[in-house]
Amino acid sequence: MDSEESRCFSGYDGNRFKLVILASQRAHELSSGAATLVDRQGDKNTVVALREIASNQLDLSTVFGLAVQRCRKYLEEFAGSRGIAGHSSHVSPSRSSRHTGLGKSFVDNKSTYSASFLDQDKFLSGGKDDGIEGF
């Protein structure tokens, strides 16, 4: 790992998949005009986001909440634009049923759509059951 990578990751000891989601959301915020919490040092938004996470200057639960909202909005728009009727082929019942209370529904005039979301506490806790299989 070179000095640039170690500078970004030195303060973060969580799951790398969670890091990607959090950094993506924060980079999106920075691209939308949010103020940086660390010196930019000529870095791109993704690197700045990683350095902010590593420095523990962000409220990760807030960043996670914004990522979930963005995901829900995207799924609602996607389902509406596709006119998906009555079934959810993207989420298997066995996967969503093992995450108690994590299924969310999207309702329109025609039908109900389901999607499974990882809840904030499990996401931030770094627990073994983080919804990512095979890694």
From Swiss-Prot:
SMART domains with a match to the protein in the record: RNA_pol_Rpb6 (SM01409)
Gene Ontology MF terms in the entry: DNA binding; DNA-directed RNA polymerase activity
Catalysed conversion reaction: RNA(n) + a ribonucleoside 5'-triphosphate = RNA(n+1) + diphosphate
Its EC number(s): 2.7.7.6
Superkingdom to which the source organism belongs: Bacteria
Keyword presence, Lyase: no
GO annotation terms (biological process): DNA-templated transcription
UniProt KW RNA-binding keyword: no
Annotated region described as Disordered, given as residue ranges: 84-106
GO cellular component, one term: DNA-directed RNA polymerase complex
Keywords: DNA-directed RNA polymerase, Nucleotidyltransferase, Transcription, Transferase
UniProt similarity note: Belongs to the RNA polymerase subunit omega family.
Family annotation (HAMAP family): RNApol_bact_RpoZ (MF_00366)
Role: Promotes RNA polymerase assembly. Latches the N- and C-terminal regions of the beta' subunit thereby facilitating its interaction with the beta and alpha subunits.
Summary of subunit composition and partner proteins: The RNAP catalytic core consists of 2 alpha, 1 beta, 1 beta' and 1 omega subunit. When a sigma factor is associated with the core the holoenzyme is formed, which can initiate transcription.
Protein name: DNA-directed RNA polymerase subunit omega
Organism: Anaplasma phagocytophilum (strain HZ)
Lineage: Bacteria, Pseudomonadati, Pseudomonadota, Alphaproteobacteria, Rickettsiales
